[in-house]
Amino acid sequence: TRNCKAHIKIIKLITPPPHIYSSMSSIAENKFTGGAAFEFELVPGRKVGPNHPCFVIAEAGNNHQGEVPLAKKLIDMAVESGCECVKFQKRTTNAILTKAILDRPYTGRNAFGPTYGEHRDALELSFSQFEEVKKYAESKNIAFTASGWDEASIDFLADGLDVPFFKMASADLSNFPLLEHTAKKGKPMVISTGMADIDLVRKAVTLVK
């Protein structure tokens, strides 16, 4: 890699005992579905819910550092670890950052460019690179998706890559315009709720339903 060398330990996953995912699913049912069965197909041929094993997703994020070979290595490691899906992140930097932040000098030892905008751009994969990475994941029989952090990225993931589901970051739980834009794509959504209170979670769920 360019500025730092990744040291990644592969841990083989073991399917958890049934009571773990059953109890978690029961909580979801009681809180948001009024006790109705919480079960749906997240990727083709794979349902999630009370009577199904945990669906384990490897978080690749932007750890590819803008390099396709490293992205493929992350996929290989996800497969070797026993994950069913690998998830990346997609951002349009000039859509989510102000000009002042984009132009800010960024000269730390791990910087990938002289400004923060150039640094962030260097950590992104292009559309064509994402297409290559998705095809590689498919060749390894592992599901592929990504978190879209802006509407342009969501459009690409839905219309360009046709991801099976969207993963929304907890940072965007209160980003109602982005949640609504994503929900209109008609695909399943997995929405993180870190640091949110239950009222905000309810509002987000109501919006996307």
Predicted regions and their residues:
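Active-site-adjacent beta->alpha loops and helix N-cap segments on the catalytic face
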Residues: M168-G186, D197-L207
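Hydrophobic faces of well-ordered beta-strands that scaffold small-molecule active sites
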Residues: V56-A58, V86-F88, F144-A146, F166-M168, ...
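Active-site beta->alpha loop and helix N-cap motifs at the rims of alpha/beta catalytic domains
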Residues: A111-S170, N175
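Glycine-rich, proline-tolerant flexible connector loops at the mouths of alpha/beta enzymes
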Residues: E84-E124
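N-terminal amphipathic alpha-helix/helix-capping segment at the start of soluble metabolic enzymes
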Residues: S26-I57
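Conserved, mostly hydrophobic/aromatic
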Residues: E59, A78, L157, S192
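Active-site mouth loops of central-metabolism enzymes
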Residues: V56-L70, H119-L123, A143-S147
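Glycine-enriched alpha-helix->loop->beta-strand junction motifs that scaffold or abut catalytic
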Residues: A158-F166, K184-M189, K209
